[in-house]
């Protein structure tokens, strides 16, 4: 009988500190800071602490879209949080986000300053602060929130479920991979049927719902996430692919997706303090 078939849960759980998964060294069953370190602060009113994972990309795409739309007050400093090194457990970061997850944002233009965590919360805050990328029509606004929170509730099955067992688990496990592959394909089908009738998630208007969903599901169908496009047969979701490609061509998406990125061939930018930082990073890969 194989290891994955023979496991019997003990009466009381205890942590296996070397369980073989990629992130074992930073996983722990308690919260709070592990070391003292003040957070960096730049010159702009918005201070972002993040990494270019799908959740991190949501916020940098939003900030770059705001700047492209002419909202100069959306200028920001973006500081890399190296989660592999445990930087999310520094005292400065935990002071902003007690949950120790990226992204976290501080708006220093308010008194007292506003501390934000959870990517969906940050998107809503920025949309309301600048009155942008959120529909004014009540019906469309409701649709925007429907899909924004659909993503918040659904993506853990894609990331923590499928992505973990397909890419990061210590060895391939048939049951969880099959279980979460099925759910991921179901979610893609939900999106595909919606986008067959709508240009964007909230109808005809590009919004924070699109910015929340694209980094996960857009990257997935474009082959940028988990190297799983063939396994999941993403070509079956033509409307999701159409939408994903359309958004990928937006300057705000092209710029936002590389901020706090330290891997890959499509541009890297460890920290962002001005528009020229992104310009230079993108120019280096042309």
Protein language model annotation of sequence segments:
Residues 95, 249, 258-259:
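Phosphate-coordinating loops and pocket residues in cytosolic domains that bind phosphorylated ligands
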Residues 1-185, 282-286:
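GST-like domain detector, emphasizing the conserved glutathione-binding G-site
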Residues 2-5, 135-136, 146-251:
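GST-like fold's C-terminal all-alpha helical module
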Residues 254-255:
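C-terminal anion-handling pockets and recognition modules
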Residues 82, 208, 260:
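Short, solvent-exposed turn/loop segments enriched in Gly/Ser/Thr/Pro and often Arg
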């Amino acid at each position: 009988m194989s290891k994955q078939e023979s496991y019997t849960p003990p009466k009381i759980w205890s942590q296996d500190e070397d369980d073989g998964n990629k992130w074992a060294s930073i996983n722990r069953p308690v919260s709070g800071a592990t070391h003292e370190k003040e957070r960096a602060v730049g010159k702009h009113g918005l201070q972002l602490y993040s990494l270019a994972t799908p959740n991190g990309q949501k916020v940098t795409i939003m900030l770059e879209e705001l700047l492209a739309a002419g909202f100069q007050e959306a200028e920001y400093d973006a500081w890399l949080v190296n989660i592999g090194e445990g930087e999310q457990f520094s005292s400065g970061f935990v002071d902003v986000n007690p949950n120790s997850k990226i992204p976290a944002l501080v708006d220093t233009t308010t008194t007292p300053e506003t501390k934000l965590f959870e990517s969906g919360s940050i998107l809503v805050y920025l949309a309301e602060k600048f009155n942008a990328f959120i529909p004014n029509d009540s019906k469309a606004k409701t649709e925007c929130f429907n899909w924004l929170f659909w993503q918040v509730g659904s993506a853990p099955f894609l990331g923590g479920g499928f992505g973990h067992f397909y890419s990061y688990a210590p060895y391939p496990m048939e049951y969880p991979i099959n279980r979460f592959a099925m759910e991921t394909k179901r979610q893609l089908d939900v999106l595909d049927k919606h986008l067959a009738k709508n240009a964007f998630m909230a109808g005809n208007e590009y919004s924070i719902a699109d910015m929340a969903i694209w980094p996960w599901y857009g990257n997935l169908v474009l082959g940028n996430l988990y190297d799983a496009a063939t396994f999941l047969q993403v070509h079956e979701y033509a409307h999701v692919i159409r939408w994903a490609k359309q958004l990928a061509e937006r300057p705000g998406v092209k710029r936002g997706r590389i901020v706090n990125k330290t891997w890959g061939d499509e541009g890297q930018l460890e920290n962002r303090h001005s528009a020229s930082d992104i310009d230079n990073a993108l120019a280096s890969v042309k």
